[in-house]
Curated annotation (Swiss-Prot):
Coiled-coil ranges (or none): none
Binding sites annotated in the UniProt record for ATP: G333, P334, N335, T336, G337, G338, K339, T340
Protein function: Endonuclease that is involved in the suppression of homologous recombination and thus may have a key role in the control of bacterial genetic diversity. Acts as a ribosome collision sensor, splitting the ribosome into its 2 subunits. Detects stalled/collided 70S ribosomes which it binds and splits by an ATP-hydrolysis driven conformational change. Acts upstream of the ribosome quality control system (RQC), a ribosome-associated complex that mediates the extraction of incompletely synthesized nascent chains from stalled ribosomes and their subsequent degradation. Probably generates substrates for RQC.
EC number of this enzyme: 3.1.-.-, 3.6.4.-
Provenance organism: Lactobacillus acidophilus (strain ATCC 700396 / NCK56 / N2 / NCFM)
Smr domain ranges (all copies): 710-785
Subunit structure: Homodimer. Binds to stalled ribosomes, contacting rRNA.
Protein's recorded name: Endonuclease MutS2
Annotated GO MF terms: ATP binding; ATP hydrolysis activity; ATP-dependent DNA damage sensor activity; endonuclease activity; mismatched DNA binding; ribosomal large subunit binding; rRNA binding
Keywords: ATP-binding, DNA-binding, Endonuclease, Hydrolase, Nuclease, Nucleotide-binding, RNA-binding, rRNA-binding
Enzyme class: hydrolase
């Protein structure tokens, strides 16, 4: 992308804001160098990564990051066998610690946050165990070598502290005792890394030892008394050994780090990438920006787009479209109406999207991925070259014409301005014709009325204007696509009190062609406002319809789940009954087998036959059980079958199998998605029979089979809660509004369980104790939604 467009559209302001939101120095540097990409796949990947961090930031919160220095200079030194200093190793420890913390942070991320797109980055956060362990034991983030780095270092530091205490105690005898009168001040200080006292010059001989320094006046000598010479010598020796031990430790740590140069570089790079992406996510949140959708035909559809550098409380959102029905847009009208800002908004949002940033526009806004974006906006004449505004303008356009192609977005402010209006308009038309032949996407602003007709008589070209409020005599800054702009001079003059005869005379002086154009524009304005009002009404109605459809689908899904639950329960009960009867039948047969060789009384045989016949009848009853029959029928439907959709009470034809248990059914002119539990296959004989008028009596039938009262008295707690759950399901299916739960008073356990269940249920509107004459505290009245 050319640097000029970045400057014209103030892209640097965006990268500055991005860098300010980054935490680490490498990420800030990366933000400052951010440039738009012209590679579609790269842009798509960048936007998806920004989306991943946006979701993570919204759901989980900010990554545990803090600032660290670039590790590349350190790893480069390791590569040439150099040893690192303590500060460099402390920075490496910080980098590894951050990687470890982020790994732990992401361990319990909500499954709703899809981080697949950044897996290659996260895979680099593999912390080398040995290096991390040794660094953590030996050094802190500021580069301070710890006592735990080695046992020798710990011993030396203990000896240093002990010897230092001895020195201070010895020196205290000089500052606190009789010798203090010979001192300039009663203090102990250090010169040349040795402890000394400030002795008055005339009392030098009182102390012996070594003079290390003197004051500027020469009146004070800094003397190391002879009594502490050995202690100071020992201290210096211990300190020298400590420094040597620290060098050994740093060398040891550097050798370990040298084995993990690639890992260190990868981890630092991954942390930088995560911080950079998180900064993008923060910027999106700050700007209330949304994910742009990419188009492969280079079309733009920015919905309620806002210029990101204008005060959010003052900026006016605009719908900006280019591509699709038209590739060239001419924005006409007077100055200060917002034409230039509209151009800059389209261009800057396009640059942001191609940089992997979210854009300040509504969701589902679309942008292309352009190879180049060119702009000629504002007066950029060069004083050094002594060029006029028009010459500078032409130089920019000539440069654009040399490079333009079908993958180019061209933005030109006041095309052809700065010269004779007639010549300028002709030149503007010719330039536009050339750019259109190159299949570029073009947005231009102009004052020339001749270009209003250009928008009508050229294919894939449209006019646009900035709306003007005649009541307030001020621009609204709203873009109107399809309507050319005009000056509104006569209307403004009238509003300001100009004499009517003067205004009318001015109107008569206009050419018929200009007058006709203005009338056409006024008519288009009225039609557009009417169309906008109608569209808003339709969008509102569509939104309501979609929400209603969603609610109905949710209700249908809930209904199917409840029906399935009831069927499963019925099947379970049937299986239990069959198992018990089989067990009893087997027992009877076994008894008969045992007694076949023994004389049996006739009445016993009759009783046994009666029991077997009874079991057979019960089995037959189960075989004819409507619930189980329906269950069986529902599992035997296929594409083309005529079925009855139970939830609608209507018939239709299965047109598609969506999944193992879901089908698409055509009912008249509509198609619905249903579960196999919600359909009954219709035999051909039934489908060819004379159609009957459908009567929706389902609710009435269900109500007749459902009781408005449930008695839980005398039941165990678990049994009562199970029965309560099943009862609520059944009354919901039956459509009852109010029911009574009798739980008694007793210990209160059942009542507490009932109330806890009702509080947690989404289907309960409210509940309270029954009136005194209907059970009082021993019963609860429940109102269902």
């Amino acid at each position: 992308m050319n640097n000029k467009i970045l400057k014209i559209l103030e892209f640097g302001e965006i990268t500055d804001r991005l860098g300010a939101l980054a935490i680490t120095s490498p990420a800030k540097e990366r933000a400052e160098k951010l440039l738009p990409s012209s590679d579609f796949d790269q842009v798509q990947n960048d936007i998806k990564q920004t989306l991943a961090l946006t979701n993570l930031l919204r759901i989980k919160g900010q990554l545990p990051l803090t600032n660290f220095k670039d590790v590349r200079p350190s790893t480069k030194r390791l590569g040439v066998k150099a040893n690192l200093n303590a500060q460099e190793l402390g920075n490496l420890l910080l980098v590894l610690s951050l990687a470890q913390e982020i790994n732990e942070f992401l361990e319990d991320v909500d499954e709703k946050v899809d981080l697949t797109i950044i897996d290659p980055i996260l895979d680099q956060l593999d912390v080398p165990d040995l290096l991390f362990r040794e660094l953590k034991k030996s050094i802190d983030y500021d580069g301070e070598v710890l006592d735990t780095a080695s046992s020798e270092l710990a011993r030396l530091r203990h000896d240093i502290a002990s010897n230092e205490e001895d020195i201070k105690n010895r020196m205290t005898t000089y500052t606190k005792g009789n010798s203090s009168k010979y001192l300039s001040e009663q203090i102990v200080t250090i010169r040349d890394d040795r402890y000394v006292i400030p002795v008055k010059q005339e009392y030098r001989a009182k102390f012996g030892g070594v003079v290390h320094d003197q004051s500027a006046s020469g009146q004070t000598l800094f003397v190391e008394p002879e009594a502490v010479l050995n202690l100071n010598n020992r201290q210096q020796n211990l300190i020298a050994k400590e420094k040597q031990e620290i060098r050994n430790i740093l060398k040891h740590l550097s050798n370990i780090a040298r084995e993990d140069i690639d890992s260190l570089n990868n981890i630092a790079s991954a942390l930088t990438s995560l911080d950079f992406l998180q900064a993008k996510a923060k910027l999106a949140k700050e700007m209330k920006a949304s994910e742009p959708k990419l188009t492969k035909d280079h079309s733009l559809n920015l919905r309620n787009a806002r210029h990101p550098l204008i005060n959010p409380e003052k900026v006016v959102p605009n719908n900006i479209r280019l591509g699709g029905d038209f590739d060239t847009m001419l924005i006409t009208g007077p100055n200060t109406g917002g034409k230039t800002i509209t151009l800059k908004t389209a261009g800057l949002l396009q640059l942001m999207a191609q940089s992997g940033l979210f854009i300040p526009a509504e969701e589902d806004s679309q942008v292309g991925v352009f190879e180049q974006i060119y702009a000629d906006i504002g007066d950029e004449q060069s004083i050094e070259q002594s060029l006029s505004t028009f010459s500078s303008h032409m130089n920019d356009i000539i440069a654009i014409m040399k490079n333009v192609n079908s993958e180019t977005l061209v933005l030109i402010d006041e095309i052809g301005a700065g010269t004779d209006p007639e010549e300028g308009a002709s030149l503007a038309i010719s330039i536009l014709d050339f750019l259109r032949k190159k299949d570029a996407k073009i947005m231009v602003t102009t004052h020339y009325p001749e270009l209003k007709l250009y928008g009508y008589n050229r294919p894939r070209t449209t006019n646009a204007s900035m709306e003007f409020d005649l009541k307030t005599l001020s621009p609204t800054y709203r873009l109107q696509i399809g309507i050319p702009g005009h000056s509104n001079a006569f209307a403004i003059a009238r509003r300001l009190g100009m004499r009517e005869d003067v205004v009318k005379n001015a109107q008569e002086l206009m050419s018929d062609e200009d007058s006709d154009i203005n009338k056409m524009i006024a008519k288009l304005n009225a039609q557009t406002k009417a169309a906008t009002t109608a569209r808003n009404r339709l969008e509102t109605s569509l939104d309501r319809s979609q929400k209603l459809e969603q609610k109905l689908q949710q209700a249908l899904d809930w209904y199917n789940q409840r029906v399935q639950k009831q069927l499963d329960f019925a099947q379970e009960r049937a299986n239990e009954i069959i198992a018990k009867r089989r067990k009893k039948a087997d027992k009877i047969i076994e008894q008969l087998e045992q007694q076949k060789n023994v004389g049996i009384k006739e009445n016993k045989i009759i009783e046994a036959k009666g029991e077997l016949n009874s079991l057979e009848r019960q089995a037959n009853n189960l075989a004819h059980n409507k619930v189980l029959q329906r269950e069986k029928r529902r599992h035997h439907v296929s594409i083309g079958d005529r079925v009855k959709v139970l939830s609608y009470g209507q018939t239709g034809t299965i047109t598609k199998q969506l999944s193992e248990h879901e089908y698409e059914v055509q009912m008249g002119i509509i198609k619905v998605k249903v579960s196999d539990r919600d359909v009954e296959r219709i035999d051909n004989s039934q489908s060819t029979a004379k159609p009957k008028r459908l009567v929706r009596a389902t609710s009435a039938v269900r109500r007749s089979n459902a009781h408005s009262e449930l008695d839980l008295r005398g039941q165990r707690y678990d049994e009562a809660m199970t029965n309560l759950d099943r009862y609520i399901d059944s009354v919901l299916l039956a459509g009852l509004d109010t029911v009574t739960i009798i739980h008694g008073i007793g210990t209160g356990a059942i009542r507490k369980g009932v109330w806890q269940y009702l509080r947690s249920s989404n289907h309960v509107k409210n509940f309270n104790y029954a009136p005194a004459n209907e059970g009082g505290n021993g019963a609860t009245i429940v109102q269902l939604k």
